From Swiss-Prot:
InterPro entries: P-loop_NTPase, RecF/RecN/SMC_N, SMC, SMC_hinge, SMC_hinge_sf, SMC_prok. GO terms for biological process: chromosome condensation; chromosome segregation; DNA replication; sister chromatid cohesion. Homodimer. Residues 534-647 form the SMC hinge domain. Residues 785-818 are annotated as: Disordered. It comes from Desulfitobacterium hafniense (strain Y51). It is found in: Cytoplasm. This is Chromosome partition protein Smc. PANTHER family: STRUCTURAL MAINTENANCE OF CHROMOSOMES PROTEIN 3. Residues 803-818 have a biased composition (Basic and acidic residues). It comes from the Bacteria.
């Protein structure tokens, strides 16, 4: 598929960087032949066609498959950041001179940044998009030609209406430039006709103005001479009046200075007094703080003294208690010592008794042994052994019974003693526990009272601190309120003075001409001749402050024009002025005055500096509309002079234009401007300022009353706060005393409860010991009772046996009975002594145990006595230290009281001095207020004189453009009456002249000159109109001829291409209206092989697509493009049609350079160079190229 070296190479290369998926810079080198770009779906191959379309000037983001132009910039990927710019360049071969540039190579570049800024370049030089369009015009290339054809273009051809399809023929016929020239010519023709109509209207208007204006100019020249003389006379009059006012002001200045000096001295003196008062108040506050601190110190010392006294009282009570305890323990010790002595003596007596009983028992036992020996001998003799045995056993049993009875009696006695002691201890313990419970309850109550009092003290302390803070805050608020009230009073005085000055000016109608002033004053007095007057324009309108200057300048002297209900009322007012020689005035009768507003040109109304028609920017009663429209209806208001010149130009210099700063552009183009010397309030602003001042003064007075009420309320609050603070401090002091008493009670109760608790513990211990001893005795008693019962039974049995035996042996010998009796008595006596001995031993053991216990108790009491004596001695030793502390605290307390009394005396002296100073300061204030009132009255007069001076000076400046110094040069030897008489003569002459148009002097020659100029322009425009109509007719003829030629050529080519693409068949283009070649539509008739002729819309999808492609190829044949980009236009074709499509474009590549974007195999097979677009990296396209020559392939990465 190699091509000859003579094949055209128009588009040499393409560079793309940052455009859509081409993040990195890539370059496509386009050689001869057919180049095909291939790649998988989504790889970005169609972005190449978008890049070419974009650089050729595509402005629709939708056509580039985006929502906004910034979407063409690479937006980043998962691994790459977005770039800030997209740039595409096309390199063209211009060796054939297809472009009208003196370069062999032409580079077209387009660049866009992320902020939306775009740039175009031709050979690296910045240019306009229009320059690029003109460069490609009628070259066959370009965005609107056939150099870029996508699948969408095929669909577009298929869906175009017949009227729209003719544009394809027009492009191929090369009449686009004629169509553009015709549009420009029609636009110019429309503008020319519009200008011509406007000039005709202006000329007609001027023709009606020239005659009257010439007459007005003659009158105006005479009026100018009279006005000049009148001006000089009025200047002299104003200067005369100002001289008198100046003299008054000079005198006023001297008096003001004297009053100000006196006020300054009074202020200084008052300031010094107030400074002294403030210093004394500061000292008083410091004294209050010192007194408060001293009170706190005194209170703390009182507390300390109370605590020491309380401690001393507690110690005295403790010492008394210890004395009582010592006495009690001493008594108990003596009792225990007596018990020990008695126990010792009893023990000694018992031991002696024990020894005696032991000796007697031994003697009895010896006697008993002898008697038993003799009895045994007797029994042996008498056989009474058994009786003796029984009697011995009985005796032994009886002895045991006696012992058991004695022991039981002892146990019973001891138990009775223990029970009595236990009952006494139980009662004593109950009494002690009841006393302990009572003390504990009392202590708990005291603790609760302490807690409540402490909480109350904390609450009172917090309330006291809060009261201190609130009182201090209220004092600060009071001081701040006084300062604000003083500032408010000063501001109110200033505003009130300004208000009264302006009100006086308004009431006296200062600023108005004499005639206007006299008429309005007469109307106020209900003068019959003035009953028809409505008021001046200044009185009848309201305007926002920002428009005041503009409206005042727009009205000029007309601001003093008087509106009347009827023309008759105006004439009556004129007669009144003449009859009383009161000057002149201008009237606007509502029944004859003509209103109307200027029509604002559309271009002028759309100007950003245009604000509106002057009459629309003011507010007035509807009945006065015609009056205001007559003065302001033809005046436009704009922001500044630049806007004024633009609006004047847009409105053809027919309207009067005023800026917000007062500069003017007059009809015809003349300008008036400069600085405005506006001193004080003007007529428009004065009423507004009076209203504002009245409102501000009312607001200040309301604020004054509110602040005075607030100050009174604060004073009441401060007084209540101080009373509350005093009350709280008293309560706090009472609470501190009550707390000291409660704490003393708590300590006493705690000490007594501790003592009782110790006694209860000791009683409980004794009771436990008694209970244990009683349990043991009861156990022994139970055993003894059981043994006694057994012994009684045994004795009874022994007695019965003995009785039986005795009954048997009653007849024994009398010797044996006597012996037995004596033996029995001896045994009984021996048993008795033995029992006594045993009891003595037991009693001795008990007494020894009791003696040990008494000795132990004696030692413990001695130890308690020693501890008590040591405690008492320690208390006695510490008593002196506490007495010393009490004396020292009492001295400190006395000193603190003395300091507090001294501080209070000093405060009383300082308070009296402060009251005297405040009384003197009040007198100084009254003196100052008297001086300030005098100064205020003088300032009011001065303000009135200043207003008169300002009015006169402003009149000099605004009416005569003179300063006071310059006006003094006009003074002559004539007095004021002579000057006034001459002014009246001039005014009479001016009345005879009637209305004077001063501007006519300058306007007439200018209007004549403008009339001549516009007449010449009218002639030129008529000639231009005729020339443009002739040009349009020639362009229509040329376009019709060229369209017809192009249609025939495209139709013939279409027939041929259709047959080649379909391998037969027939197709043609038909005109919908052959008689109207400029607007006729174009229909496509096709007859594929084997089918009948039918419209394009009736064919199958593949046939319609191939037919549309055939039409595109026919257009290319008629008007070949140096290069052509085809973006997947064969996508809907089958393989056979794709092959025919590829073969056909291969043949066309002899005259046209093709770059085809495709994924069809047949197209790729026909390619000379293949470019592969891949996306190895997500979201980033990469370019590969393959040069095909036979079977050799050279692959490289671009």
């Amino acid at each position: 598929m190699a091509k000859a070296d003579t094949l055209p190479v128009f588009l040499k290369s393409i560079t793309i960087q940052g455009f859509k998926s081409f993040a990195d810079k890539v370059k496509l080198e386009l050689g001869q032949g057919l180049s095909v770009v291939v790649g998988p779906n989504g790889s970005g191959k169609s972005n190449v066609a978008d890049a070419i379309r974009w650089v050729l000037g595509e402005q629709s983001a939708k056509n580039l498959r985006g929502s906004k132009m910034e979407d063409v910039i690479f937006s980043g990927s998962s691994v790459r950041r977005p770039v800030g710019m997209a740039e595409v360049s096309l390199f063209f071969d211009n060796s054939t001179g297809i472009f009208p540039l003196e370069y062999q190579e032409v580079i077209i570049t387009r660049r866009v940044y992320r902020d939306g800024e775009g740039q175009y370049f031709i050979n690296r030089s910045s240019c306009r998009l229009k320059d690029i369009h003109e460069l490609f015009m009628d070259t066959g290339a370009g965005k609107e030609g056939f150099s870029i054809i996508g699948q969408g273009r095929v669909e577009e051809i298929l869906n175009l209406r017949s009227e729209e399809r003719r544009t394809l023929i027009e492009e191929a016929s090369g009449i686009t430039k004629y169509r553009m020239r015709k549009r420009e010519a029609l636009k110019r023709l429309d503008e020319t006709e519009h200008n011509l109509e406007r000039i005709r209207d202006i000329l007609a208007e001027i023709e009606g103005q020239l005659g009257p204006l010439e007459e007005q100019a003659t009158i105006a020249r005479e009026a100018v001479e009279l006005t000049t003389e009148q001006k000089a006379l009025e200047i002299e009059i104003v200067a005369f009046d100002l001289k008198e006012v100046r003299h008054k002001l000079t005198t006023s200045v001297q008096e003001t200075e004297e009053l100000q000096s006196a006020i300054a001295a009074a202020v200084a003196d008052l300031s010094q007094k107030e400074s002294e008062i403030l210093g004394n108040k500061v000292k008083l506050n410091l004294l209050d703080e010192q007194i408060q601190k001293q009170q706190e110190t005194t209170y703390q010392l009182d507390q300390a003294v109370n605590q020491i006294v309380q401690e001393l009282r507690l110690r005295q009570e403790r010492e008394g208690y210890l004395g009582e305890q010592i006495n009690r323990v001493t008594t108990e010790l003596s009792s225990h010592e007596e018990k020990v002595r008695q126990s010792t003596e009893q023990l000694r007596a018992l031991e002696d008794r024990k020894a005696l009983l032991h000796k007697t028992l031994e003697q009895a036992n010896q006697a008993l042994a002898a008697d038993e020996q003799r009895l045994a001998e007797a029994k042996a003799r008498n056989g009474l052994e058994e009786i003796e045995i029984l009697r011995g056993s009985l005796s032994h049993l009886q002895s045991k019974l006696a012992e058991s009875t004695a022991e039981l009696n002892r146990f019973t006695h001891q138990l009775a003693t223990l029970n009595s002691t236990h009952e006494q201890l139980v009662k004593e313990k109950k009494d002690k526990e009841a006393a302990l419970f009572s003390h504990e309850q009392q202590e708990a109550q005291v603790q609760e009272q302490l807690k409540a009092q402490e909480e109350l003290q904390t609450d009172i302390r917090l309330q006291t601190e809060r009261a201190h803070q609130e009182t201090a805050q209220l004092r600060e608020q009071s001081k701040a309120g006084q300062r604000e009230l003083q500032e408010l009073n000063r501001d109110l005085e200033k505003k009130s003075a300004r208000y009264h000055a302006l009100k006086n000016l308004e009431d006296s109608l200062e600023g108005y001409q004499r005639g206007v002033r006299e008429l309005m004053l007469a109307k106020k007095k209900n003068q019959p001749s003035c009953g028809d007057l409505c008021g001046t324009l200044a009185d009848l309108l309201q305007v926002e402050e920002r428009y005041e200057v503009a409206v005042e300048v727009a009205l000029g002297a007309g601001i003093q024009n008087i509106v009347t209900e009827t023309e008759r009322g105006a004439k009556e007012a004129v007669h009144y002025l003449k009859s009383h020689n009161l000057g002149r005035a201008t009237f606007l009768p509502l029944d004859v005055i003509q209103g109307g507003k200027a029509t604002v040109a559309k271009e002028a109304a759309q100007d950003p500096g245009f604000i509106g028609v002057a009459v629309d920017l003011i507010t007035f009663a509807e009945k006065y509309r015609k009056a205001f429209e007559s003065q302001l209806g033809r005046t436009l208001i704009v922001t500044d002079m630049e806007a004024a010149t633009r609006v004047a130009r847009a409105s053809g210099y027919r309207a009067r234009i005023v800026t917000l700063e007062g500069d003017q552009v007059h009809p015809g183009g003349s300008l008036t401007g400069g600085s405005l010397q506006r001193k004080g309030s003007n007529l428009l602003g004065r009423s507004r300022e009076i209203q504002e001042l009245r409102q501000e003064c009312d607001e200040r007075r309301t604020q004054q009353k509110e602040m005075e009420l607030k100050a009174g309320a604060l004073g009441t609050q401060i007084q209540k706060g101080e009373e509350n603070l005093k009350h709280l401090m008293g309560e706090e002091q009472e609470l501190k005393s009550a707390l000291a008493v409660l704490r003393t009670q708590e300590l006493n109760l705690r000490a007594q409860a501790q003592r009782i608790h110790e006694e209860v513990t000791a009683i409980a211990a004794r009771m436990a010991g008694i209970e244990q001893e009683r349990d043991e005795l009861q156990s022994h008693k139970a055993l003894g009772a059981e043994e006694q019962s057994k012994l009684t039974d045994s004795i009874q049995e022994a007695q019965e046996a003995l009785a039986r035996q005795e009954e048997k042996n009653r007849q024994a010998s009398r010797e044996m009975e006597q012996l037995q009796e004596r033996l029995t008595q001896t045994k009984v006596q021996a048993a008795k002594w033995e029992q006594e001995l045993k009891q003595a031993v037991e009693r001795l053991a008990q007494d020894q145990a009791l003696l040990g216990e008494n000795k132990h108790l004696l030692e413990r009491k001695r130890k308690d006595l020693q501890d008590l004596e040591e405690s008492k001695a320690r208390l006695a030793f510490e008593q002196g230290d506490w007495e010393s502390r009490r004396r020292e605290a009492g001295e400190q307390q006395q000193q603190a009281q003395e300091v507090l009394i001294a501080l209070r005396k000093e405060r009383e002296v300082l308070s009296k001095e402060l009251m005297d100073q405040e009384s003197l300061a009040q007198k100084k204030r009254q003196e100052q207020q008297t001086l300030e009132q005098k100064l205020h009255n003088l300032e009011l007069k001065t303000a009135r004189w200043d207003a008169e001076w300002e009015t006169g000076s402003r009149r000099l400046l605004e009416e005569f453009d003179l300063t006071w110094d310059e006006a003094q040069t006009y003074q002559s030897e004539r007095n004021r009456a002579e000057l006034g008489a001459r002014v009246q003569e001039i005014k009479l002459r001016m009345e005879l002249l009637g209305p004077v148009n001063q501007a006519a002097i300058e306007e007439y020659p200018k209007l004549q000159e403008r009339y001549d100029f516009l007449s010449v322009q009218k002639q030129d425009l008529e000639e231009a109109n005729e020339s443009l109509q002739q040009l349009i007719a020639e362009l229509d003829k040329t376009m019709s001829e060229r369209f017809e030629e192009g249609f025939i050529a495209v139709n013939e080519a279409f027939k041929v291409v259709f047959k080649e693409l379909f391998n037969g068949g027939y197709a043609e283009l038909r005109l919908v209206d052959p008689t109207n070649l400029l607007d006729t539509g174009v229909e496509i008739i096709a007859q594929p092989p084997g089918k009948k002729p039918q419209l394009l819309s009736l064919l199958s999808g593949g046939e319609r697509a191939l037919t549309a492609i055939g039409l595109l190829f026919a257009l290319l044949k008629v008007k070949p493009s140096p290069f052509c980009v085809l973006d997947e236009i064969e996508a809907s074709l089958d393989d056979a049609n794709v092959s025919r499509f590829a073969q056909y474009i291969h043949r066309l590549s002899d005259s046209t350079q093709f770059l085809v974007i495709s994924h069809r195999k047949g197209t790729m097979e026909a390619a000379d160079v293949l470019y592969g677009i891949t996306m190895e990296e997500s979201g980033v396209s990469k370019l590969l190229s393959v040069q095909l020559e036979g079977q050799d392939k050279d692959t490289r990465t671009a």
